[in-house]
A protein has these predicted regions:
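Charged catalytic and DNA/RNA-contacting regions of genome-maintenance
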Residues: 1-217, 224
Length: 224
């Protein structure tokens, strides 16, 4: 039932599933005109719901950004593109391959996409076509999304950043079936502006998530 959809979505997403939403694409009257009185009303997938592309407020954690990230490697440098589609904020950065794990731990992404067949990608990444992680394609997609002829007004982006941005936008286009969410101009993050912590350090400090016996006692929540 439609009124129970959010409850089922929550259970499926928490279980690691991706959900396809199908809806009627024509009225019963249009179906009759097309195929007579026994014609079935046409239905089609209108959206894919994934952990990193949730927009339903009831399914989002109010104190935590729901981050979708795309990662790739270009000429020995890893590019990272991250966004929260509920706010439209988009961040781009690059790092050496050995610091990719720490960068992803800092982001705490709900979902990560990476080029199919990339050996350095984390085990839980969603594989995507390698062709969507082209730096030239990423530059073109950013220009198209923001309706500009050049990206100079947004900052300086490396080829790795642009490739990751291309993969991110292509994935959003895929799950939205051609309808992109509102995205703000990308912001470049500098490595010197952050203290890097690996995943084990963040877990032991309980910065974002506490252990089960201390539910609701995360450091950031206690310090607000």
């Amino acid at each position: 039932p439609v009124h129970s959809a959010e409850g089922y979505l929550a259970r499926l997403i928490k279980g690691g599933c991706r959900v396809a939403i199908a809806e009627q694409t024509e009225t019963p009257e249009e179906a009759k005109k097309r195929g007579g009185s026994k014609a079935l009303v046409a239905r089609d997938i209108v959206r894919f719901v994934t952990a990193g592309t949730l927009t339903e407020e009831a399914l989002l954690e109010p104190r935590r950004a729901n981050v979708l990230a795309a990662i790739c490697e270009v000429r020995g440098t890893c590019g990272i593109a991250a966004c929260d589609i509920s706010t439209g904020r988009m961040e781009l950065e690059e790092c050496p391959p050995e610091r990719l794990g720490a960068a992803l731990a800092r982001l705490g992404a709900s979902e990560v996409v990476a080029p199919d067949g990339w050996d350095a990608s984390p085990a839980d990444c969603i594989p995507r076509p390698v062709s969507t992680f082209s730096s030239d394609g990423g530059e073109a997609r950013l220009k198209a999304v923001h309706g500009v002829a050049t990206l100079d007004g947004f900052g300086q982006f490396s080829r790795a950043m642009l490739a990751a941005a291309g993969g991110l936008i292509a994935y959003l286009d895929h799950v939205g079936r051609g309808r992109l969410p509102l995205l703000l101009p990308p912001v470049v993050l500098g490595q010197s502006a952050h203290l890097a912590m690996d995943e084990a350090t963040r877990a032991s400090l309980e910065i974002l998530r506490s252990e089960e016996r201390r539910v609701g006692k995360e450091c950031l929540r206690l310090c607000r």
